[in-house]
Amino acid sequence: MPRTQRNDNFIDKTFTVVADILLKVLPTSQREKQAFSYYRNGMSAQAEGEYAEALQNYYEAMRLEVDAYDRSYILYNIGLIHTSNGEHGRALEYYYQALERNPSLSSALNNIAVIYHYRGEQAIENGQSEISQILFEKAADYWKEAIRLAPTNYIEALNWLKMTGRLTGLAT
């Protein structure tokens, strides 16, 4: 089950060592330890661009993990992979599932907004201005919530909201 460390990144190696120590000393069940090991292996594979391997590890982690909060991060990372592969519809499904388990996951809200904004831009290119406005409004709603949860994390989104007059309903 342990993944060989192919990445020479000091931070990744340090994380792996610390995670291994924590797994040994924390009072967790064998199932929880296995779930975390799969999750960690998934993150390592994802960082190296090995998306198929990362997905396999994340699916195994999902099979074993029972904690909703921990599952939210697994689902979020699966969404990231689908986003990277241009599978935006599938990515949205996983981001929504992550938010069901962890409504404070601002990065999932941000990524949903980014996808809606991208789709809005595509609609403009296709001459569908009404659809683009609907998509931009959806993006704005998700960005406002992400900014509400993490006010300093999404400066570009905040600027876009200001420039497009969509800042209403957000205390800044």
Curated annotation (Swiss-Prot):
Family annotation (InterPro entries): PSI_Ycf3_assembly, TPR-like_helical_dom_sf, TPR_rpt
TPR repeats: 35-68, 72-105, 120-153
The keyword Cytoplasm appears for this protein: no
Subcellular location: Plastid, Chloroplast thylakoid membrane
Keyword match Metal-binding: no
Matching SUPFAM superfamilies: TPR-like
PROSITE patterns: TPR, TPR_REGION
Any Gene Ontology biological process: photosystem I assembly
Chain's role: Essential for the assembly of the photosystem I (PSI) complex. May act as a chaperone-like factor to guide the assembly of the PSI subunits.
Record-given protein name: Photosystem I assembly protein Ycf3
Organism: Chlamydomonas reinhardtii
Organism lineage string: Eukaryota, Viridiplantae, Chlorophyta, core chlorophytes, Chlorophyceae
